[in-house]
């Protein structure tokens, strides 16, 4: 998830900027969420009887005891006839609010094996943030290095080492609709390079991806 903290004189406000993980029209890859309700706990409890590594003899005895009712778990076995609730979720790593690891982009990064998501230091994921506003950009338009420099000049800010830059385009207002995926601006190569060379450690954006939509990139290519 993504949070933004606003520090006041004596307190800090934490704002959750992340999207919910849920099936919707903005996600090009399917999300499946299967929920086992509390009322279905007895079915889960039934599986527990046969779980674990057992000898064939023990398994046979477990079946006999279950069929005879000696080890049978039903709704009545639980207080209020309820058991634990659980969810099984199937999704892409490129779902909702997420962090792309260097390994997402290729097999080499700066001449080395790129870091996978579990190798990303947590220190990379928090720090001082600055919001750059490009809400004036339309679908498939490019955010140039000149745009970035002008915005920094407008807010009177000089990028610092290890800053986290959040790119605002207001594309997130389309979340839940199909056009969220294909109607968004994107960072140019030069603009991204400028941020990286300025010492920025994380770049966030409210679009599906940091680049322009796939269809626009393919057409340009």
Language-model-derived ranges and their functions:
Residues 5-221:
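Active-/binding-site microenvironments in catalytic and ligand-binding cores
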């Amino acid at each position: 998830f993504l949070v933004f903290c606003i520090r006041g004189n004596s307190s800090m406000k934490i704002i959750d900027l992340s999207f919910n993980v849920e099936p919707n029209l903005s996600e090009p890859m399917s999300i499946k969420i299967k929920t086992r309700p509390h009322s279905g706990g007895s079915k889960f409890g039934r599986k527990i009887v046969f779980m674990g590594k057992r000898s064939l003899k023990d398994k046979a005895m477990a079946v006999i005891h279950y069929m005879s009712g000696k080890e049978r778990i039903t709704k009545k076995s639980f207080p209020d006839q309820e058991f634990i609730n659980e969810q099984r979720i199937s999704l892409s790593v490129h779902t909702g609010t997420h962090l792309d690891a260097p390994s997402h982009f290729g097999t080499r990064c700066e001449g080395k094996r790129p870091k996978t998501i579990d190798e990303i230091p947590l220190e990379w994921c928090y720090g001082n943030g600055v919001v750059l506003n490009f809400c004036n950009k339309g679908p498939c338009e490019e955010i140039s290095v000149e745009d970035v420099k002008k915005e920094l000049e407008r807010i009177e800010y000089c990028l610092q080492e290890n800053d986290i830059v959040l790119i605002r385009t207001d594309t997130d207002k389309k979340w839940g609709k199909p056009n969220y995926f294909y109607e968004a601006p994107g960072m140019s190569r030069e603009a991204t390079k400028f941020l990286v060379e300025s010492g920025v450690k994380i770049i966030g954006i409210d679009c599906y991806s940091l680049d322009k939509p796939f269809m626009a990139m393919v057409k340009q290519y």
